[in-house]
């Protein structure tokens, strides 16, 4: 419906997507093909299949449609634009060292400092640090999305299946509190090695 409505618009149109909705992201290809610009914080379209990533960028270029997703990685720092500029100059980064998840960094710091894992998750959620569904963070899905967007912006043709992560929670655990003992043990193991969780 939106595409049909936008087809009659004489003025340039920009769609701003501040959701985490795949249903909204599913419209990107049609909107770009219609000449609409897109500004998005939604990671789903850019972190899906590599073929989808390439289609979106090809459509944006072919139709002169601005396509901006800077806020998907780095909390709106001008990181992706800088990476793309390096690639355009032939100086593509070959390595990144980064904290890709502020929420996971916060969680691990709280657990390291003695808070139970479940309490740290509740606190991070109350502070608005996690995704609306904290499993996106705890199962590292949000982190993988950021990594894919960053790597693809640097020219790497990665598929989601090529990224290996260790989720912070066991999907089979009936409740988050079931993870407290595991994380307490991990803190003690790290401390015994003179290390910290990070």
Feature names for model-found ranges:
Residues 110-111, 118-198:
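Substrate-binding/catalytic subdomain of NAD(P)-dependent oxidoreductase enzymes
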Residues 21-34, 43-70, 75-86:
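Rossmann-fold NAD(P)-binding glycine/threonine-rich loop
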Residues 38-39, 66-67, 131:
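Hydrophobic beta-strand scaffold residues
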Residues 32, 39, 98-99:
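Short conserved micro-motifs on helix faces and helix-strand junctions that flank
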């Amino acid at each position: 419906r939106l595409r049909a409505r936008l087809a009659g618009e004489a003025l340039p149109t920009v769609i701003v997507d501040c959701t985490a909705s795949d249903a909204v992201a599913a419209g990107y290809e049609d909107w770009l093909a219609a000449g609409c610009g897109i500004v998005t914080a939604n990671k789903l379209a850019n972190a899906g299949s590599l073929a989808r990533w390439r289609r979106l960028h090809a459509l944006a270029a072919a139709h002169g449609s601005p396509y901006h997703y800077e806020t998907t990685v780095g909390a709106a720092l001008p990181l992706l634009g800088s990476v793309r500029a390096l690639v355009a100059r032939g100086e593509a980064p070959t390595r990144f060292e980064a904290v890709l998840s502020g929420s996971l960094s916060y969680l691990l710091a709280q657990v390291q400092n003695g808070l139970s894992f479940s309490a740290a998750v509740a606190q991070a959620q109350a502070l608005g640090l996690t995704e609306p569904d904290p499993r996106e963070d705890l199962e590292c899905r949000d982190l993988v999305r950021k990594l894919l967007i960053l790597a693809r912006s640097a020219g790497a043709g990665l598929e989601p299946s090529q990224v290996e992560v260790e989720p912070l929670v066991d999907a089979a655990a009936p409740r988050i509190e079931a993870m407290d003992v595991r994380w307490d043990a991990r803190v003690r193991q790290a401390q015994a090695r003179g290390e910290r969780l990070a």
